[in-house]
Each structure stands twice: as structure tokens, then as C-alpha cells.
């Protein structure tokens, strides 16, 4: 009820619909099951229809069709069914067992009105149920299983995950989870066993391309092609990495073979179209786009290329029609809106792009036009974008491509601007920053610390951590901008001395910033300086008019440190004073409250204060609303129940037996009683 009590509407509990094409919402452990994570194919667009089946009052669901949801069950003498129709239905309901008719009746059903009936039947043969001649169920009459549809639900226990294929599967699945460091680790293990494992080479080439290592990606793709010249992924990566590396002839060769594979055909034709545009071959580009659209008619990339080609080749009516069609499908298609705006003489997008980081949309579109060789459009978009150093760097670089003018004199001016809300994330931006640094150095100008910072956070984003650290260490103590030191501390988290110095510097620069206090206290805790952590937290909490969220974030952190040093009662009192708004999956506050109560109760039991201990064990089982966690239907109270029994009968053997079945953290809470 905790969520319902906080809702501003009045129509009861809400439902969160989750859409998807897969059998389940895969988690990390799904790697070791048959239900792997799935990645998107490049430039792929997929559409599907979903049917939702409310089963209110049916008791369950056995089968579903586009007409209705059906629930079957057995009694000793009857077959009973519930039908929940998703539309008004009229027709003959026929039930057969082993081709012998059991039931035949005309029925009229209303949408979502539960229909229940039964027929005498004690057999266990094959059941067939139809409504108005259309199938509702066809399967076993006792288990209600539909024959020959069982899908394997567990992986074979004797599958060798350390085999070449097992290592490859792990690496590929981690890549699909976007856990790229782990993906590289497991693919590397596979390639150590077999340096010419073609699928692993392709996946590794893809990871290297993402990191901006185009030459290395191309080398791995070529290594795979030395084994199989027609491998689809390796050819596509040969095209993609060579295109980024500037080897357009090699790129065309890779794409030309990749089009043999349906999975990469549309993307490869799109790449060929981009190269044709850069070479000024408008007819060739249009031909490639048409082939891409023939395979993927809904591909945004191909549709954008087509409408741009129409506009650039003076076919305004076709361009307008293509842009309007794209906007009808997706009103947030800013590429189409820009194309339509250019045609109408009003290419202004500022009133349509209203997200938190609008400049990123402009950069994304500008890079798309640059890749197609349309530098004038790229520059026009960048000039519309909100002020931001990355926007200005791209604009300067694009202007240089158009006019070949001198740009070094503006780079330092751009780079000395505030780095607020600057988050370079694209591998293309890594090469822009590297070019910029080289140009400044060549012209004898100093390189502002902001450039090293941008390059460092981008390298970190691309999992090139050692290079990122080099960029940060090159900066030293020059910045007076506190977030720089918070980021540095996070990057160097495992190097405690560097992280601690960075956090101290951040707090010195912004003593009133709660984040500096919170992160420095966390660091103190990691090096067993709990008292120092409590001291700086209390200094902040003693300030007046703190926002509620600051009070509960630092208050909960204080309670954790109090538990760490054994001040359980004080921790409980702090938790009682907090007000934590619930958020999905957040259970840390309640877990801490429960832990504090259990640890204090154990301490009281150890000291013979049974009555007081029982009070805190009862409190550990409560779910105070101020802690933001709603009580589950079946809370796990095994530990508190066992401790209550121990408080009464002092049977240490029974307590040990229960505790051994619990997680290690739970066992640690009662160590002083059973060691």
C-alpha cells in the first residue's frame, strides 16, 4: 500500500506494462541459461503486435488466442473452463476429447466478462476446443500441456563453458549486456585457446571499433577473413572500421561482401551510400539507399539519406513527401524535421528539441551529415545548437573542412569555457579531441586542462581506463572546478591515496556541497576512518534548511557508519527520524534499519537482557513507512524468528541450524551468540 498511498490519482493501484519480443527480461544470470541477451542488428528496425490478456476472475491462464484467454482445470468428475474474451464473441463452443464431442453450445460473450462452465469428463485424452470454428486449445486433457511445444528451460549440466564455444558465448552475451570489459575478457580467453575463432574475432573487432581503435578493429576483421572471406560480421566490421579510418576503397570492399548476409545487408548498403555521397556520386548513393530500403523499408538511416538526396538533387516534392511520411511515423524524428525545414526555408529546431541535453541531439545529427560529406548541413545544425564547448569544437572543425581556414586561434577560447554539462561520449569525439590537441601543440599554444579532462572522461567511457588516468594525471591541481576532483576520485577509486586527495580538494573548493561530504565520507569508510566520516556528516547535517533529500541521504549514511562502529541504538534513532521517498528497488534503508535492530538485539541477548532484545526483534520485523519500502507479501523473518526462539529456550543448536541456511551477511549478525 505504500505506493498507492502516495499516488496523486484516486483510481487505485496502477499497472506497469512492459513490452518486449523475448521470453523473459534477461538478467545477468541468464548467460548460463538458454535465454541469452539479444543485441540489435545495425540499422535494424523491428515492428510487432502484442496481445494483452486480462485474466480477472478466471483463476489463471492455460492458453490464449487473439480471441480470448482460456483457463482449464479438473475436478474428479468434470472439466471446468473460464474464458475471458478480448472482444465481443458469438459462436459455437465445441469441446472434443479424442475426437469425441463432449460439449456443443452457442454462446455470446462480452469483452472481459468472465464466462465459466463445465462438462462431465473424467478422462485424460487429447482435448480440442474451438469457438466459432477457431481454435482455443489443442492439447493434453489432464496436464493441459500443448504437445510438441516444450522448449528447453535449462542449459545442459555437462555443457563445457570453458570450451572455445562456451567462452565465446559468455563474451558475446556480456557484450549484449553492454558489459564490455567482461566481454573483452571472455572473448580474449576464447582467442587465447584459438586465435582464429572467427565469431570471436568478429565480436572482438566490434568491441575495438566501439573504443575508437579503428586500425586494431580492422586488423582483427581481416584476421577473421583470412579464415573465411565471406564471414558477414567480419566483412561489415572491415567496412565500418575502414570507413572511419579513411580507407574508403577498403570500406567499400568490406561492405560489398557484407551485403550477402541479410543481417548486415541494409547497414552495408547504407555504408556504401554514405561513401558514395562523400565521393560525390549522387546516383550511386541513391541506388544503394534504394537497395537498403528494399531490405529494411522502415530504416530511419536509409529514409534520412533518401530524403536528403531528393532535396540535394532538386526533387523537392519527393523530399517533402519522404520527410512528412517519416514525421507521421515518428513525430520526434528531428532529421526529418530539419530536412522539411530546409525545404520550407525554416530549418529551426530549437522549439522541438527540449530534452535535458539538447546540444547532444545537434551533435548527433551534425555527425551524421558529416559522415555523408554534407558539411554545410552539419555546420547549419551546429550553429542552431545551444552553447557548449563540444558543439563549438565540432563547428570549428566542420568550418575548417569547408573553408580550410586557420582555426587554432579559436580553439583555446572554446576550451577555456566552463565544462558544465560537457559529456563527450562518441568515439568520433576522441579523434576530434586528439586532432585539437595536436593542432594546439603544433601552433605552440598551451593545451587547456579542459581538453585533457574531456579526453579523459571519454577514454573512461570507452573502457580505456589506463589512458584516461594518464589524461587526468596530466592535469594536476590546476582546475578550480570541484566536479573535476569528484570525477577523478571515482576514476582512481582503487588507488585510495589519489582518490582521497581529490575528494579533500573537492571539499576544500566547495565546502557547502553535500556531494563532496557524501563522497568523502564514503571514502573515509572504505579506509576504516568511520569517526572522521561521522564528523564531516554531522557538520553538514547541523546546517539549517537542508533539503529533505540531503537530510535522508546523509542521515542514512550516518546510520550506516554508526552500525559499523557498533552504535546500533543510535543508528536506529537516526533511521526513525528520516523521511525517505520510495523508489523502485530501493530497500537499503529498511535493510539497514533491520540490521541495526537485529545487531542490537543480539548484543542485548549476549548481555542477558532478553525482554529488551525481544522488543528490538519485533521492531526489526516492522516496515516503517518513513523508510520508503513497502512490506512484501511474505517477508523473510527466519532470522528474527530463530532469535526469538533462542531468547526463550536458549537452544544454541537450533539457532545454528537456522543460521547456516541464511546468507553470510545474516550469519555475521549473530556471530557473537554462536561462535
Regions found by a protein language model. Name each.
Residues 61-162, 334-345, 403-432:
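Long, contiguous interaction/recruitment modules in multidomain scaffold/adaptor proteins
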Residues 1-45, 53:
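A contiguous, surface-exposed recognition patch within enzymatic or periplasmic domains that forms
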Residues 200, 234, 268, 302, ...:
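TPR alpha-solenoid repeat register
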Amino acid at each position: 500500500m505504500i505506493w498507492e498511498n502516495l499516488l496523486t490519482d484516486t483510481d487505485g493501484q496502477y499497472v506497469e506494462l512492459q513490452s518486449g519480443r523475448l521470453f523473459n527480461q534477461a538478467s545477468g544470470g541468464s548467460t548460463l541459461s538458454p535465454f541469452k541477451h539479444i543485441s540489435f542488428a545495425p540499422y535494424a528496425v523491428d515492428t510487432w503486435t502484442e496481445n494483452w490478456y486480462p485474466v480477472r476472475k478466471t483463476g489463471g491462464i492455460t492458453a490464449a488466442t487473439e480471441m480470448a484467454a482460456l483457463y482449464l482445470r479438473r475436478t474428479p468428475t468434470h472439466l471446468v473452463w473460464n474464458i475471458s474474451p478480448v472482444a465481443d464473441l458469438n459462436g459455437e463452443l465445441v469441446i472434443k476429447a479424442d475426437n469425441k464431442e463432449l460439449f456443443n453450445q452457442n454462446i455470446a460473450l462480452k469483452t472481459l466478462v468472465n464466462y465459466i462452465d463445465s462438462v462431465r469428463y473424467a478422462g485424460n485424452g487429447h482435448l480440442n476446443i474451438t469457438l466459432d470454428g477457431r481454435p482455443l486449445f489443442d492439447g493434453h486433457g489432464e496436464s493441459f500441456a500443448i504437445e510438441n511445444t516444450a522448449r528447453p528451460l535449462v542449459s545442459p549440466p555437462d555443457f563445457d563453458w570453458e570450451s572455445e564455444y562456451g567462452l565465446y558465448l559468455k563474451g558475446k552475451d556480456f557484450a549484449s549486456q553492454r558489459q564490455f570489459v567482461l566481454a573483452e575478457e571472455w572473448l580474449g580467453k576464447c582467442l587465447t585457446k584459438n586465435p582464429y575463432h572467427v565469431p570471436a574475432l568478429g565480436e572482438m573487432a566490434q568491441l575495438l571499433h566501439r573504443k575508437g581503435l579503428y586500425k586494431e578493429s580492422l586488423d582483427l576483421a581481416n584476421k577473421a577473413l583470412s579464415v573465411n572471406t565471406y564471414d558477414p560480421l567480419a566483412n561489415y566490421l572491415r567496412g565500418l572500421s575502414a570507413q572511419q579510418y579513411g580507407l574508403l576503397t577498403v570500406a567499400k570492399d568490406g561492405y560489398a561482401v557484407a551485403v550477402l548476409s541479410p543481417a548486415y545487408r541494409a547497414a552495408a548498403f547504407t555504408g556504401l551510400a554514405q561513401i558514395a555521397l562523400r565521393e560525390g556520386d549522387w546516383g550511386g548513393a541513391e541506388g544503394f539507399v534504394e537497395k537498403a530500403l528494399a531490405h529494411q523499408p522502415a530504416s530511419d538511416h536509409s529514409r534520412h539519406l533518401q530524403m536528403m538526396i531528393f532535396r540535394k538533387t532538386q526533387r523537392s516534392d519527393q523530399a517533402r513527401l519522404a520527410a512528412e511520411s517519416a514525421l507521421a511515423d515518428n513525430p520526434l524524428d528531428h532529421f526529418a524535421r530539419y530536412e522539411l525545414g530546409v525545404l520550407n526555408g525554416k530549418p529551426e529546431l530549437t522549439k522541438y528539441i527540449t530534452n535535458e541535453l539538447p546540444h547532444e541531439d545537434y551533435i548527433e545529427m551534425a555527425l551524421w551529415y558529416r559522415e555523408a560529406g554534407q558539411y554545410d548541413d552539419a555546420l547549419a545544425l551546429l550553429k542552431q545548437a545551444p552553447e557548449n564547448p563540444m558543439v563549438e569544437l565540432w563547428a570549428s572543425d566542420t568550418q575548417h573542412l569547408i573553408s580550410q581556414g586557420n582555426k587554432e586561434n579559436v580553439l583555446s577560447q572554446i576550451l577555456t569555457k566552463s565544462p558544465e554539462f560537457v559529456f563527450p561520449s562518441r568515439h568520433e569525439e576522441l579523434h576530434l579531441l586528439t586532432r585539437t590537441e595536436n593542432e594546439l601543440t603544433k601552433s605552440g599554444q598551451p593545451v587547456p586542462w579542459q581538453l585533457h579532462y574531456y579526453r579523459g572522461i571519454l577514454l573512461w567511457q570507452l573502457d580505456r581506463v589506463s589512458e584516461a588516468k594518464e589524461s587526468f594525471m596530466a592535469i594536476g591541481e590546476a582546475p578550480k572546478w570541484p566536479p573535476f576532483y569528484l570525477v577523478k576520485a571515482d576514476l582512481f577509486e582503487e588507488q585510495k591515496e589519489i582518490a582521497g586527495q581529490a575528494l579533500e580538494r573537492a571539499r576544500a573548493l566547495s565546502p557547502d556541497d553535500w556531494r563532496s561530504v557524501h563522497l568523502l565520507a564514503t571514502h573515509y569508510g572504505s579506509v576504516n576512518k568511520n569517526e572522521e566520516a561521522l564528523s564531516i556528516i554531522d557538520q553538514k547535517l547541523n546546517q539549517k534548511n537542508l533539503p529533505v533529500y540531503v537530510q535522508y541521504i546523509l542521515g542514512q549514511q550516518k546510520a550506516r557508519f554508526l552500525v559499523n562502529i557498533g552504535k546500533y541504538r543510535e543508528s536506529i534513532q537516526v533511521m526513525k527520524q528520516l523521511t525517505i521517498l520510495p523508489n523502485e528497488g530501493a530497500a537499503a534503508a529498511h535493510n539497514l534499519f533491520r540490521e541495526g535492530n537485529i545487531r542490537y538485539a543480539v548484543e542485548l541477548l549476549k548481555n542477558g537482557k532478553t525482554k529488551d532484545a525481544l522488543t528490538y526483534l519485533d521492531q526489526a520485523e516492522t516496515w516503517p513507512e518513513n523508510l520508503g519500502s513497502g512490506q512484501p507479501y511474505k517477508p523473510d523473518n527466519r532470522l528474527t524468528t530463530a532469535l526469538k526462539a533462542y531468547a526463550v529456550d536458549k537452544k544454541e543448536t537450533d539457532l545454528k541450524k537456522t543460521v547456516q541456511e541464511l546468507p553470510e551477511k545474516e550469519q555475521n549478525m549473530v556471530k557473537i551468540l554462536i561462535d
